[in-house]
Amino acid sequence: KDNNVIIALEAHAGTDFETPEKAVWIMEKTNHSNLRLDLDISHFYIEGSDVDHSVDLCAPYAAMVHIKDGKKVDGEVKYCLTGDGTINIEMFLLALSRNNLTHLPVFAEVSVQQSSKRDYDPRFTAEFCYNSLMEAINKI
């Protein structure tokens, strides 16, 4: 606490820490000013939680924000690049704004499921994610 270090926990699809309700529960039970949340909407979305509901619940505890995309296929989590799935990025950004989180940068996360592929191209990936986020920003 003396050094102002913040630890940001990230919920994760396919684990026991996969819903916004559980994330808030942990924040309330620990009740420590240096323990916050990394708001990664993809994990909540993949588990079936509504984007607005997830952001509304977790916003008071968010220290950082990132996004990737994905879905469950036969019970297995499959991640994809931001903008290459079905998460409504504009809705997510509007929910961040509505919850006064625009001061936090939104990081595009690349899952090891993509980065470990033989044909992974980091430049293409960075440009694709950037363009997806900018397209959403320009629409709102």
Language model segments and positions:
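Aromatic-lined substrate-binding rim segments of carbohydrate-active enzymes
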Residues: 1
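Histidine-acidic metal/acid-base catalytic patches
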Residues: 17-39, 45-140
